[in-house]
């Protein structure tokens, strides 16, 4: 029996979009039925049958269900109409179990969901590497009326996720509606991993307004501040970020965590190399994160990257995804590989 001391750490929490932007709702909640791959035994082993099934999934149309921005009650809370079903099996609210199993010291996770509204049902699911889903557990809010409250905890092992898969939860509101006040994925980790690390965010820019707006986003995120050591801007443009009309607000938000470094135009690689050099010289942050300047940042992504790095089995490069700025729920690529003999990147098949 192990005598190693452990502590509870938050891995990720339920979040809603900061600005209630309807374009990004699909990244946080899903109002449609899950369109996962049909079980191979139902489709058959014939290639033509598989292709036909995959085409049917791609061509399936939306039911037209909508979520009103006013249903987002806070950064972590969401209101459901009476009898409304809703899934949190989404990019930001599902839990990437297979990645945590493979790359971190975490072996089991606990999901806690806080729901208000009698008769509301929480159901936990998992997906497998082939894409089909399995129901894991469920719970119902007992009592009467819209003020009835339920706090449900589910212990979920990561052992089944050898070759892929996610955990997530769905909620169906009762007759009086429901409010999903929050949810948290936590784990017991070794005591020497109790404290979270900090990060230097390194931004190379020639776009003063866009980079200043990004700095403002980082400074406005109160929950992010304990994780930030320094935000370094390598300013390589003719027009300076400090001259942007957005800069005073950004400077006020970040305070002494902000550092602007003016240098010649050395390209992206030269800018990020300078950021890494300054981070190593300073030596006060656990990690250095390279970030584009022309992006809208979800601050929770930085927190989750730091948390994943803290709990990795070995020192690990933690990558982040990028979405289309003009079609904000469109993911450019879920993963990439580098061919070492030609140093050329490709999307993972």
Residue ranges of predicted features:
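Acidic donor-binding segment of Leloir-type glycosyltransferases
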Residues: 218-261
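Glycine-rich, basic loop-to-helix element that forms the pyrophosphate-binding segment
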Residues: 263-279
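Long, charged/polar, low-complexity intrinsically disordered N-terminal extensions
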Residues: 1-110
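Glycine-rich phosphate-binding loop signature in dinucleotide/nucleotide-binding domains
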Residues: 279-285, 312
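Conserved donor NDP-sugar-binding/catalytic core segment of glycosyltransferases
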Residues: 296-346
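Short beta-strand-to-loop acidic/aromatic patch adjacent to the donor-nucleotide binding site
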Residues: 283-296
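Active-site-adjacent "gating/activation" loops or surface patches in catalytic cores
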Residues: 252-255, 267-269, 343-349
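N-proximal low-complexity "stem/linker" segments adjacent to membrane-targeting elements
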Residues: 59, 70-74, 78-80, 88-118, ...
């Amino acid at each position: 029996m192990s005598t190693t001391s452990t502590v509870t750490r938050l891995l990720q929490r339920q979040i809603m979009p900061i600005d209630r932007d309807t374009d990004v709702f699909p990244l946080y909640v899903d109002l449609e039925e899950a369109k996962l791959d049909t079980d191979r035994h139902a489709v058959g082993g014939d290639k033509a049958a598989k292709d036909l099934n995959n085409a049917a999934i791609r061509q399936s149309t939306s039911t037209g269900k909508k979520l009103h921005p006013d249903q987002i009650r806070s950064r972590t809370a969401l209101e459901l109409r009476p009898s409304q079903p809703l899934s949190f099996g989404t990019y930001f609210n599902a839990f990437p179990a297979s990645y945590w199993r493979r790359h971190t010291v975490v072996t089991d996770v606990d999901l806690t969901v806080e729901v208000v509204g009698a008769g509301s049902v929480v159901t936990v699911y998992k997906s497998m590497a082939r894409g089909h889903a399995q129901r894991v557990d469920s719970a119902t809010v007992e009592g009467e009326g819209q003020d009835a409250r339920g706090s449900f905890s589910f212990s979920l092992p990561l052992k089944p996720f050898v070759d892929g898969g996610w955990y997530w939860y769905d909620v169906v509101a009762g007759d009086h509606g429901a409010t999903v006040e929050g949810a948290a994925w936590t784990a017991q980790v070794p005591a020497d991993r109790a404290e979270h690390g900090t990060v230097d965010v390194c931004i190379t820019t020639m776009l003063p307004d866009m980079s200043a707006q990004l700095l403002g986003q980082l400074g406005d995120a109160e929950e992010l501040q304990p994780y930030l050591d320094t935000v370094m801007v390598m300013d390589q443009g003719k027009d300076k970020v400090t001259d942007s009309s957005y800069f005073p607000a950004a400077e006020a938000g970040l305070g002494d965590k902000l550092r602007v470094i003016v240098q010649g135009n050395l390209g992206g690689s030269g800018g990020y190399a300078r950021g890494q050099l300054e981070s190593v010289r300073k030596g006060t942050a656990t990690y250095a994160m390279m970030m584009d300047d022309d992006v809208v940042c979800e601050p929770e992504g930085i927190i989750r990257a730091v948390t994943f790095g803290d709990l990795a089995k070995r020192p690990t490069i933690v990558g982040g995804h990028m979405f289309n700025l003009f079609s904000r729920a469109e993911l450019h690529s879920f993963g990439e590989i580098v061919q070492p003999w030609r140093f050329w990147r490709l999307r993972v098949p």
